[in-house]
């Protein structure tokens, strides 16, 4: 076995071969801390303001338009009737979601801003703190666009699914299957952006969509059978 020489030279074994030295790996603590700080610096409460509108819009667009198309298909099996009803639901729903979200978030913004001003007036340096705190308030325009755009994306899923299927039964099966897949995807994306459990979110989306579609199809089928025949 090789022994270290007193002058610190590279040790040799008994046959004269140089023993390799194992380099020490140094962890860059500054880089690790910077990565950790970047991850923890994400304001998930700020993200939740537009994420809530986007998740609500996507789920509402998908479920409402799918349910509307299935309801129309329950009494009229024509593909054109289902597509026209779905497109009308997309336009009306996107506009309604955008206006409703804008009014709701504007009201929330005004209430929170008024409360914030009252609290700042009671403390010193309130004007300076007010400008900083206003950045945490919800943005009405951001929520409006997120809601309208996500509603349209969700509503396009059943429309595109039914557009290329001629047979009624096959069309309904394809629409339900694609809507179910989209519900799982929306639930997973929402959970990923909000850092919440994915399984719980996907199950919640899926069950809610199935219940809405079942109720709409069943009641419309019952009404059509009793009133139109």
Swiss-Prot record:
Instruction: Tell me where the transmembrane regions lie.
Output: 55-75, 83-103, 145-165, 172-192, 205-225
Induction per the UniProt record: No significant changes in expression observed in response to short- or long-term iron deficiency in nodules.
Give any GO molecular function from the UniProt entry: manganese ion transmembrane transporter activity
Topology class, membrane: Multi-pass membrane protein
A GO cellular component annotation in the UniProt record: membrane
Per UniProt, the keywords (alphabetical) are: Endoplasmic reticulum, Ion transport, Iron, Iron transport, Membrane, Metal-binding, Nitrogen fixation, Nodulation, Transmembrane, Transmembrane helix, Transport, Vacuole
Q: Which residues form the signal peptide?
A: none
According to its UniProt entry, one GO biological process term is: intracellular manganese ion homeostasis
Keyword Cell cycle carried by entry: no
- What does the similarity note say? Belongs to the CCC1 family.
Protein name stated in the entry: VIT-like transporter 1b
Q: What is the lineage of its organism?
A: Eukaryota, Viridiplantae, Streptophyta, Embryophyta, Tracheophyta
